[in-house]
Amino acid sequence: MPPPAEVTDPSHAPAVLRQLNEQRLRGLFCDVTLIAGDTKFPAHRSVLAASSPFFREALLTSAPLPLPPATGGAAPNPATTTAASSSSSSSSSSSSSSSSASSSSSSSSSSPPPASPPASSPPRVLELPGVPAAAFSDVLNFIYSARLALPGGGGDGAAVAEIGALGRRLGISRLQGLGEGGDAWVPPTPAPMATSQPEEDSFGPGPRPAGEWEGDRAEAQAPDLQCSLPRRPLPCPQCGKSFIHPKRLQTHEAQCRRGASTRGSTGLGAGGAGPGGPAGVDASALPPPVGFRGGPEHVVKVVGGHVLYVCAACERSYVTLSSLKRHSNVHSWRRKYPCRYCEKVFALAEYRTKHEVWHTGERRYQCIFCWETFVTYYNLKTHQRAFHGISPGLLASEKTPNGGYKPKLNTLKLYRLLPMRAAKRPYKTYSQGAPEAPLSPTLNTPAPVAMPASPPPGPPPAPEPGPPPSVITFAHPAPSVIVHGGSSSGGGGSGTASTGGSQAASVITYTAPPRPPKKREYPPPPPEPAATPTSPATAVSPATAAGPAMATTTEEAKGRNPRAGRTLTYTAKPVGGIGGGGGPPTGAGRGPSQLQAPPPLCQITVRIGEEAIVKRRISETDLRPGELSGEEMEESEEDEEEEDEEEEEEDEEESKAGGEDQLWRPYYSYKPKRKAGAAGGASVGGSGLPRGRRPPRWRQKLERRSWEETPAAESPAGRARTERRHRCGDCAQTFTTLRKLRKHQEAHGGGSHSSRAGRRPSTRFTCPHCAKVCKTAAALSRHGQRHAAERPGGTPTPVIAYSKGSAGTRPGDVKEEAPQEMQVSSSSGEAGGGSTAAEEASETASLQDPIISGGEEPPVVASGGSYVYPPVQEFPLALIGGGREPGGGRGKSGSEGPVGAGEGDRMEGIGAAKVTFYPEPYPLVYGPQLLAAYPYNFSNLAALPVALNMVLPDEKGAGALPFLPGVFGYAVNPQAAPPAPPTPPPPTLPPPIPPKGEGERAGVERTQKGDVG
């Protein structure tokens, strides 16, 4: 009878192992998670159980009837080995190939696994206490790839000894002699054909000898592969080149296979090897990538006197070596930063932080101008461009001569990165539902031979229908649960979450303060009352509301990536609400008014380009809008009115909307936008935003909720308090908006200045006492009162002011006021000396008495020859012109009247005592720009500029008053009292020349006043 035909595939076992390794790297079909140190390693239970007796016993401890391990024979049974390895291999072409594939991974255990898999699933999370993550990463790579790159090319004795000790504890025979001076892992001498000869005997038909494990691994330990860079994410099995993206690795593998098929056609014996040979045979003879042969992992370059450290993998350059070492974690196998919400592990902490934001929904990027928070930096940049007219990219970089951009050295960030509120501590404690006896004694076993002799661990004292899950807990006050599988139970009495199922689940319990779910992603919280935590601003998560159904129905229905056979549950969205209050927050609004009380910004300093430096102190109460009462709001408005004009405009924007959350806005912006006050006024119900501009979300939310609360401004008292608050400093008239007040002030000044569209007028008012420049006359008036308060004992400079109904007032009884914007000259002495002053003023007019005659009523002559002054003139500047006697009466011509020093202009030759202000029939046009035009001392006799057209014509049709000359002067009375600042008596000016071309009316007026001839 002819022997049965047999078909063998020598490359099947390496191909299956390579596919399993690729699945592990991608996280596919992994049914167990190993925790070593602070790192999570996903793996396959079948591969671990077939490679290590420790993992086999640890994974079988939760079975209902664990079979005692056999005490082992010399050679394993191919039938049982095939049954045990069927779970780890994807498919087998024949029984012999399955036998060879399984025997290569389980012969070192010296005992076959049980013939049938356990009835129930073992725990999915297994922690290895005391096992370093770096050494376990190397051992796990060896289990899956049959290759081990020794750290430092084998020269790092401490790392090699650590790997050897871990191999002895796990029962991996090939790693037991590592680090003890054995010759099993001494790197062989470089020989070109050293790896092809073991291949001829490794894949021959028939049962394999007991020492075949060492032979199979020896062919993988070529000198070139041993010196390759360790811990590459996705290495090519042919040439050892590493890749980060799996698609690039697949493209590279296709090219390597075509090259390996031509090189691997020779060197194979007649023992059944295929023409192409196994996929991994000739790969060991290929040289690895240049730069990774046991040398340094970086290249040092000197560019322009600066030392740069270049990564050998991706050729990125770094200024410091520590930055390069930190970057090298990206290319390594070590993923030290596992995600706290899923099974992903990241090489850098910032990668994990950016990833976890999508789980928690935290808004960490805060705009420093409006305190709005955003999830990503890109949303923040878009917001600042649209609402503030600022491009952060232009501030962080500058143009280069070739048209590009380079980063600035002193870049100021226009945002604040808030700390993570969902941050968890690293793994701290571990508790398992089953007794920990199977883990601890087995892990400390000195040799794998003693394991079969040890009795199997007993089952739990009171086993449940399903095995209890393993729980990883964190020491935080309130929990949020991550559920994988059917049923779970939170640790520490924090609550339970059950989904109903027969299999046990592993629960990772994070006891951090929970966050309310996002409204558009999660259903609203259940109506049942929940216990309030200690912090009043912290809301209660559905997982902590003392109910198993609450945690499942609220969060499991909205898991991020639901997969078949499990549900992923977590809480998201950070807590909102600064203002406190124990009620649960609504998920609708997440404005700055609902942030969880971050540390207040004591001072913000922003440099926007080269334009300005803005400094603003923000107290704790500024971050809590809507908490001030009506009286406090009034007090704050009064304080704002006393500030300078620069801060006054800003405060008007803050307080114009009443109780609205109008936070601080910058003074400067690049775009000439229309101001909020100019667009909609400062009415209570107005939005105060430019047209076409969408209001921010916090303002929309307040407007939507305005119907619920009746504002205080709706009452008559509140309406009167908010409507009339802008007062004119000239006529004491009140206005509802600042815009109307400014238009009214322009009417005072004649409306001569017109501002450009979209910009403020360039009018400025300078204080004569200091260098202060104010924007309005009202602000300058308030500023002048401060100077008066600073000099209580000084001699105030009197300003001529009259009372309208004072017919019998003596000229000496003048009202003395504090100096305003300009010290207009005064002739009055102290009260009581009015007669002497009036007699001196009757002789001639001095510069200190610019009194002009004219009016509807004649000046009343009192006893002593003094005259009664006309009604009060509220303006600090006297307007000069020819006066008229009512009824055609003419006053006596005393001495020569005021004479002009201009272009031959001559004022009317009336007596100095008859020169007075214009009375009521002539409305005076007083403009703020007139003050800025008089920066001179009035005691000086130099020519003074005169504002033209300052007097309007009479409304009764009497003719216009004489046109004021461009320059004028006064006759000097040498007996007049000197002014407050004493100056030498000025000389007398010659009489002015009558103006030419003044017209017939001017001549008639001079004739009536006795100035002819």
Curated annotation (Swiss-Prot):
GO CC, alphabetical: chromosome; cytosol; nuclear body; nucleoplasm; nucleus
Record field: compositional bias (Acidic residues): 629-654
Coiled-coil zones: 627-663
Region (Disordered): 67-124, 183-221, 257-281, 428-765, 783-852, 883-904, 972-1013
Zinc fingers, C2H2-type class: 234-256, 309-331, 337-359, 365-388, 726-748, 765-787
Keywords: Chromosome, Coiled coil, DNA-binding, Isopeptide bond, Metal-binding, Nucleus, Phosphoprotein, Repeat, Repressor, Transcription, Transcription regulation, Ubl conjugation, Zinc, Zinc-finger
Keyword Amino-acid biosynthesis: no
Localization annotation: Nucleus; Chromosome
Biological-process GO terms, alphabetical: DNA damage response; negative regulation of DNA-templated transcription; negative regulation of transcription by RNA polymerase II; regulation of DNA-templated transcription
Gene Ontology terms, MF aspect: DNA-binding transcription factor activity, RNA polymerase II-specific; DNA-binding transcription repressor activity, RNA polymerase II-specific; methyl-CpG binding; methyl-CpNpG binding; protein homodimerization activity; protein kinase binding; RNA polymerase II cis-regulatory region sequence-specific DNA binding; RNA polymerase II transcription regulatory region sequence-specific DNA binding
Biased composition (Low complexity): 67-110, 496-506, 531-554, 836-846
Family annotation (InterPro entries): BTB/POZ_dom (IPR000210), SKP1/BTB/POZ_sf (IPR011333), Znf_C2H2_sf (IPR036236), Znf_C2H2_type (IPR013087)
Broad class of the protein's primary localization: nucleus
Entry keyword annotation includes Zinc: yes
Region (Interaction with CBFA2T3): 186-348
SMART domains from the UniProt entry: BTB, ZnF_C2H2
Subunit (UniProt): Interacts with HIPK2. Interacts with CBFA2T3. Interacts with ZBTB38.
UniProt-recorded name of the protein: Zinc finger and BTB domain-containing protein 4
Organism: Homo sapiens (Human)
